[in-house]
Amino acid sequence: MPTSQTMEDLRADLARNIKQFRKLRGVSQERLALEAEVDRTVVSKIERCVGNPSLDTLVKLANRLDTTVSALMAPPLAEPA
């Protein structure tokens, strides 16, 4: 049975994943924004769980980070018990 997520959960997952993908690729917020053709404040807001990025923005960020929008929105894997 699927678990339901709140908007806050989704924003937190997105923030964590974008930051993680960005850091794994050694890219600053500014560089990511420049190469994805979005404003740097957009990346900052996403990583701070502020605002509501458009699908267009998510696609641009996912493309630059060599991943998918689904991966950016994915909840964390459950910790083994």
Labelled PLM ranges:
Residues 56-71:
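DNA major-groove recognition helix of helix-turn-helix/homeodomain DNA-binding modules
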Residues 16-35:
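Short basic helix-loop element that most often maps to the first helix and adjoining turn
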Residues 1-13:
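A detector for short, charged/polar N-terminal pre-domain segments
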Residues 2-3, 73-81:
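Short, charged recognition helix plus adjacent turn
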Residues 18, 32-33, 43-46, 72:
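Conserved hydrophobic/aromatic packing and binding residues within compact polymer-binding modules
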Residues 37-51:
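Recognition helix of helix-turn-helix/homeodomain-like DNA-binding domains
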